[in-house]
Amino acid sequence: MSNEGNGGGPDYDVVRRVVRSRKTAKVLADPDRPVDFDEATRARLDPLVREAILEAGWAPFHYNRAHGGLAEPWRVHLLFQKDCRKVAECLEGWSGDLAPVGKLPSMFAACGAAALITWVPQFRTGGPGAESGKQQAVDDEHLAASASLVQNALLLLTAAGFGTYWSSGGAALREPGIAARLGIDAQESLLALLFVDYPGSPADLSRKPGKNRDLRSDGWLREVSLS
């Protein structure tokens, strides 16, 4: 149902369609036989991914993080296919006995790009002493702002015709040595690993839908009426 003429409009309808059409799809390939997009495809699609991530940076943030000369509390480490294939090939060796890698090599082998999205805690650094309530609130704001960037990125990539999967990144990518290989500073905390499935990827790849999509309801909305 359109909201044009009663407070909505075409922009509302477009955004609503994108929000509803965004869906989780875990795409897997054999790490020994990774997906190989040709140069023309990469030249056409890589800039669209980069642009979507940059536009996602219009997410709101409440406090100036003032870290590394940047106000934003988030960082994005973007890998395109060549480097995704390198991770797929090497991750198990990098990890060794440190942490299980799970399906990550198969996911890196299938994607056209991957974005490691981190946030930069200001007080929640794991050092001695408890944070004050104010400090906890500031870091909660930094984390919430960074999560809004993740959703922006998912919606923009969906609107551009890409498939997406939001992974936590697992334990392996949080190992300091592996994180450093991927450009993640020691002060950053991994929030999301977004895998980007390029249009035209092989149809015979394993694709697993999100398990929670059919569990959605509107029971979380509570309208408050004060007497």
Regions found by a protein language model. Name each.
Residues 98-100, 161-165, 188:
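Short secondary-structure capping/junction motifs at helix and strand boundaries
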Residues 1-111, 227:
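N-terminal amphipathic, basic helical "cap/leader" segment at the start of enzyme domains
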Residues 196-227:
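C-terminal domain-closing interface element
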Residues 81-86, 121-123, 200:
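Short, charged/polar surface micro-motifs in flexible loops or helix N-caps
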Residues 114-116, 193-195, 223:
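Conserved hydrophobic/aromatic beta-strand scaffold that supports enzyme active sites
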Residues 56, 121-178:
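Small-aliphatic-rich amphipathic alpha-helix that forms the alpha element of a beta-alpha
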Residues 105-107, 180-207:
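A glycine-rich helix N-cap at a beta->alpha junction
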